[in-house]
A protein has these predicted regions:
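Acidic (Asp/Glu) carboxylate-rich active-site/surface patches
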Residues: 1-35, 39-177
Length: 177
């Protein structure tokens, strides 16, 4: 069913083999300068929709890997999430941007977009806009592909943001995403 591939790759295989593979980015790989953006949560009822982005270059990417930063779906306890968040904030020169939309605000905003993918694209573009304000010379942004690539490109254009954008499935394998 839905999510089976991710369950096998990120939960079952690591439990059986004791290893967690990150196919897109291997340990020690040089991290080119980029923004990584992704979202978590539902927003509509159970809790906030959080869209976050971080700037990573080779040094910051190495620091994030050393902390054990990974796809949040692989983090099994809230104490580990808090520990990672604290560690990320302590990385020298870390630059990040968050958009957190609680259920009430989510339900107010959603009718403006009439479509979850357009809403997510607005959130991703807002995070990229915040990051560009902090690191104007960053050459590219990497986002998990959650819709037709044009949806996020249109949201960036609406904010007059001209940055090279790469969208791909399983972008969470990149330490910045």
């Amino acid at each position: 069913g839905k999510g089976t591939d991710e369950f096998v790759e990120f939960i079952l295989e690591p439990q059986v083999t004791g290893l967690l593979s990150a196919p897109e980015e291997e340990e020690g790989e040089v991290c080119p300068a980029h923004f990584g953006i992704d979202e978590s949560g539902k927003g509509d009822y159970f809790g906030p929709l959080v869209i976050a982005g971080v700037y990573a270059d080779a040094r910051i990417g190495a620091a994030l890997r050393k902390l054990g930063v990974c796809d949040s779906k692989l983090v099994s306890t809230s104490s580990r999430i808090r520990s990672l968040a604290e560690g990320i904030r302590k990385v020298p020169d870390i630059r990040f941007h968050l958009v957190s939309i609680g259920p009430e605000r989510y339900n107010q905003l959603y009718p403006e977009f009439k479509n979850l993918n357009r809403f997510l694209a607005w959130g991703h573009a807002t995070v990229i806009e915040g990051l560009v304000g902090k690191v104007p010379d960053c050459p590219m942004a990497l986002s998990d592909q959650f819709a037709n690539p044009f949806v996020l490109k249109r949201a960036l254009a609406a904010k007059k943001l001209a940055i090279r954008l790469e969208q791909r499935t399983k972008a969470e394998s990149d330490v910045a995403v």
